[in-house]
C-alpha cells in the first residue's frame, strides 16, 4: 500500500506552508482505521496558517510517534520533470518521481503502511502508535511541529519515542541514523564607507577592501577540529551585495551574508561574539562603520544513544544486514523541537535527490524502509 499512499501524497501540491489537502487525506485514512485524530491550524495571519495533525491509536505506553511534514519546496521548472508534472507521481521501472518523494512523503507513506499493517496483525499490542505531521517544516517552521508538540502535551499526551522520517541515508538505506543535528546561524554584515570618483580615492573610503579582508579571514578560520558524531564547524559566504553598476564610482556601502553550521562546541551567541571581534578589528583599521545582524534557527544538539535508539539501530542492522552509523550531518530539521520532549531517531530514505528536479525514490528502498518501521514496531510494542 505504501506505493499507493505515496502516489496519492505526491498529488497534493503542498508547497510550504500549505497542506493542499495532504494532511486531511491522512486524517481521513487514519480515522478509518480507528485512530483518534485532531487537526489544528496555527498562524498569525491567513498567509501564515499552518495545518497540523496529531493522530493516536491506543492509550498505553510506550507511545511511538512518527513525526513528519507534508510540505515540500518549490518544484522549479515543471517542463524539466518527468511528464512535466512534479505533482503527479510518475513510475518508471523501480523509481517513483515527484516532488516530495524522498523529502518526505515517501517516509510518511511507509510508516502509514507499516503502522496500519502492524495494527491489523497485532490486535493486543501493549503500547500506542501516533503521528505528528505538519505543513510547515521547509519554511519558517514557526507554527508547525514546535507549536503542535506544546499543544498535545497541554492536552495530556506524552510521546515516549519518536521517529522523524527525514531522508537521512547517504548511499544505501540503513547506512545512517541521525541522533543529533548541527546548529545554524545566519549573519548579515553591512559596511559603510564613503563614495567618490575612482580617480580620487583619497577623497573617498572604499568599503570593499575591508569586506574582502574580513571575509578572507572568516572563511579561513578554523573554528574547531570536529568531535565525535560531529564534523568540523563550517562558515560559508552566501551573498555579496554592492549595488554599484557604475565602473568609475567607489561604492558607499557593501553587504555580505554568510552562514555557520556548527557543532555543540559552540552556540550561536559565542560564534557571533567571535565573528564580531574580527569585524570590529578590521573596520577600525580601515576607518569604516559596520552593522552586524545575526539570527539562529537552530542550536546544535546531540543525544546519548538511549536503549530505544540502540534498539532501533539493531532493528536496522538485523533487517537490512547493514550496520548504521550514528550521524549529525545535514541541515536542520524538526528534530530540534522533538528532542525537548523525548528521545528520537531520524531515519528515512536516501537524501541524494531531495529538493532536486526529478526527485525520486526507488520502490525497493520504500520496501526496505517499510520493513524497518514494521520490524521496529514489532520489537518495541
Curated annotation (Swiss-Prot):
Sorted keywords for this record are: Amino-acid biosynthesis, Cobalt, Diaminopimelate biosynthesis, Hydrolase, Lysine biosynthesis, Metal-binding, Zinc
- Residues holding Zn(2+) 2: 103, 138, 355
What pathway does the annotation place this protein in?
Amino-acid biosynthesis; L-lysine biosynthesis via DAP pathway; LL-2,6-diaminopimelate from (S)-tetrahydrodipicolinate (succinylase route): step 3/3
Give the top-rank taxon of the lineage listed in the UniProt record for this protein: Bacteria
For the protein in the UniProt heading, the enzyme class is hydrolase
EC code(s) of this entry: 3.5.1.18
Q: Which residues bind Zn(2+) 1?
A: 69, 103, 166
Listed cofactors: Zn(2+); Co(2+)
Single GO molecular function: acetylornithine deacetylase activity
List the SUPFAM superfamilies. Answer: Bacterial exopeptidase dimerisation domain (SSF55031), Zn-dependent exopeptidases (SSF53187)
Read off the HAMAP family from this record: DapE
Q: Which family does it belong to?
A: Belongs to the peptidase M20A family. DapE subfamily.
Q: What function is annotated for this protein?
A: Catalyzes the hydrolysis of N-succinyl-L,L-diaminopimelic acid (SDAP), forming succinate and LL-2,6-diaminopimelate (DAP), an intermediate involved in the bacterial biosynthesis of lysine and meso-diaminopimelic acid, an essential component of bacterial cell walls.
Any idea what this protein is called? Succinyl-diaminopimelate desuccinylase
Organism equals Rickettsia massiliae (strain Mtu5)
Amino acid at each position: 500500500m505504501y506505493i499507493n499512499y505515496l502516489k496519492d501524497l505526491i498529488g497534493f501540491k503542498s508547497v510550504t506552508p500549505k497542506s493542499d489537502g495532504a494532511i486531511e487525506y491522512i486524517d481521513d485514512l487514519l480515522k478509518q482505521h480507528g485512530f483518534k485524530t485532531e487537526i489544528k491550524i496555527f498562524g498569525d495571519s491567513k498567509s501564515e496558517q499552518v495545518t497540523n495533525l496529531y493522530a493516536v491509536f491506543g492509550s498505553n505506553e510506550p507511545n511511538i510517534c512518527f513525526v513528519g511534514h507534508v510540505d515540500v519546496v518549490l518544484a522549479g521548472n515543471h517542463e524539466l520533470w518527468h511528464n512535466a508534472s512534479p505533482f503527479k507521481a510518475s513510475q518508471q521501472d523501480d523509481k517513483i518521481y515527484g516532488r516530495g518523494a524522498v523529502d518526505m512523503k515517501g517516509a510518511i507513506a511507509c510508516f502509514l503502511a507499516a503502522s496500519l499493517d502492524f495494527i491489523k496483525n497485532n490486535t493486543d499490542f501493549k503500547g500506542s502508535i501516533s503521528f505528528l505531521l505538519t505543513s510547515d517544516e521547509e519554511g519558517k517552521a514557526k507554527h508547525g511541529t514546535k507549536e503542535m508538540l506544546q499543544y498535545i502535551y497541554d492536552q495530556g499526551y506524552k510521546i515516549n519515542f519518536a521517529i522523524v522520517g527525514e531522508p537521512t541515508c547517504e548511499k544505501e538505506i540503513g547506512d545512517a541514523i541521525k541522533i543529533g543535528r548541527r546548529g545554524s546561524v545566519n549573519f548579515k554584515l553591512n559596511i559603510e564607507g564613503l563614495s567618490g570618483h575612482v580617480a580620487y580615492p583619497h577623497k573617498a573610503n572604499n568599503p570593499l577592501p575591508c569586506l574582502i579582508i574580513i571575509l578572507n579571514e572568516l572563511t579561513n578560520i578554523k573554528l574547531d577540529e570536529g568531535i565525535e558524531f560531529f564534523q568540523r564547524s563550517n562558515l560559508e559566504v552566501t551573498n555579496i551585495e554592492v549595488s554599484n553598476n557604475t565602473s568609475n564610482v567607489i561604492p558607499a556601502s557593501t553587504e555580505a551574508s554568510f552562514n555557520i553550521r556548527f557543532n555543540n562546541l559552540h552556540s550561536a551567541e559565542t560564534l557571533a561574539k567571535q565573528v564580531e571581534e574580527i569585524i570590529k578589528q578590521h573596520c577600525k583599521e580601515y576607518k569604516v562603520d559596520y552593522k552586524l545582524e545575526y539570527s539562529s534557527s537552530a542550536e546544535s544538539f546531540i543525544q546519548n544513544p538511549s536503549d530505544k535508539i540502540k534498539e532501533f539501530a539493531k532493528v536496522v542492522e538485523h533487517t537490512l544486514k547493514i550496520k548504521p552509523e550514528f550521524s549529525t550531518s545535514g541541515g536542520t530539521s524538526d528534530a530540534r523541537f522533538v528532542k525537548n520532549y523525548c528521545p528520537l531517531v531520524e531515519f528515512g530514505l536516501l537524501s541524494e535527490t531531495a529538493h532536486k528536479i526529478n526527485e525520486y525514490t526507488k520502490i525497493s528502498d520504500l520496501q526496505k524502509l517499510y520493513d524497518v518501521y514494521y520490524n521496529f514496531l514489532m520489537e518495541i510494542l
